[in-house]
Design a protein with these regions (language model features):
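Short glycine-/acidic-enriched loop or helix-start segments at secondary-structure transitions
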Residues: 18-19, 42, 61-63, 93-96, ...
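Active-site phosphate/pyrophosphate- and oxyanion-stabilizing loops and adjacent acidic/basic residues
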Residues: 20-24, 91, 120, 137-138
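Short, glycine/charged-enriched secondary-structure capping and boundary segments
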Residues: 21-23, 47, 64-67, 98-101, ...
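Pocket-forming structural segment of enzyme catalytic cores
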Residues: 97-177
Length: 252
């Protein structure tokens, strides 16, 4: 079977780190689109899954590209495509499916501990308490109707699932260079910026690499969906052949 074809909706406003990071972490054929342009695929057909990246925008801002992106994502969900949102993408998926995104009134940034429930395919092989880099001042305040919270910490919900849709608030794709660049770009007190920079160490990055497993797990989920669709297609084809044979026998 060929590698899965994934639509990557890049919402990162020309940040050079974002495409590099997702190309490195996603072992798939990627079709990349600049959502801010706005540039979106003409159709959801031809893709096996969708990834929505982070962004410096807020989901609730009145920017002309945000709602078309949400509408396209809803179409992909309705078509049964597995979706993964990261940070802003996590929030957009929640918003698109009827959840609530709100300002936190504070900033979570740096390598932080997060806890997951231990029974999700997304976190298979990840310790229930794990480390990941975080940077956000908005949160999914309420997950979409019918969704399950998969992970959280003392700041916010950090992962949810609804059917074939997964969102993670943390950044499993970040390398140390990205973590430093993002931190230096924040409008925060100098002392806090320095504390976060001091925490971007090889040891903390090594600990956070465990969180990258969510990409492998999500792609494995995509493959399972593909295989199920192929099996279903074969079964439907066999049923049609049986029906045609029965019709032919009746004609005789």
């Amino acid at each position: 079977m060929s590698r899965p074809r994934i639509a990557v909706l890049n919402a990162a406003h020309d940040d050079a780190n974002t495409p590099r990071n997702f190309r490195r972490e996603l072992d798939a054929d990627l079709a990349e689109f600049d959502a801010n342009a706005p540039e979106l695929p003409e159709s959801v057909e031809g893709f096996d899954g969708v990834v929505v990246t982070g962004s410096r925008s807020s989901v609730y801002w009145d920017e002309q590209w945000i709602e078309p992106t949400a509408a396209w994502v809803r179409e992909a969900v309705d078509a049964g495509l597995p979706c993964l949102g990261v940070c802003w993408g996590h929030q957009l998926l929640a918003h698109a499916l009827g959840g609530e995104v709100a300002a936190m009134g504070e900033y979570e940034i740096g390598y932080r501990e997060i806890e997951h429930g231990g029974d999700s395919v997304l976190f298979e092989g990840v310790d229930e308490r794990f480390t990941a880099f975080t940077t956000h001042s908005d949160e999914v305040a309420e997950v979409p109707p019918g969704a399950d919270v998969l992970a959280e910490n003392d700041y916010s919900i950090h992962a949810f699932r609804k059917d074939r849709v997964f969102g993670v608030q943390f950044h499993p794709e970040y390398d140390p260079e990205t973590a430093r660049d993002v931190t230096l770009g924040k409008d925060l007190p100098d002392e806090r910026i320095q504390r976060v920079l001091d925490g971007i160490t090889e040891e903390n990055y090594a600990n956070a690499c465990e969180a990258k497993t969510v990409f492998e797990n999500w792609l494995a989920f995509v493959e399972d969906v593909r295989e199920s669709a192929d099996t279903s297609g074969v079964a439907e084809g066999d049923a049609e052949l049986d029906a045609d044979s029965a019709d032919a026998a009746g004609a005789d």
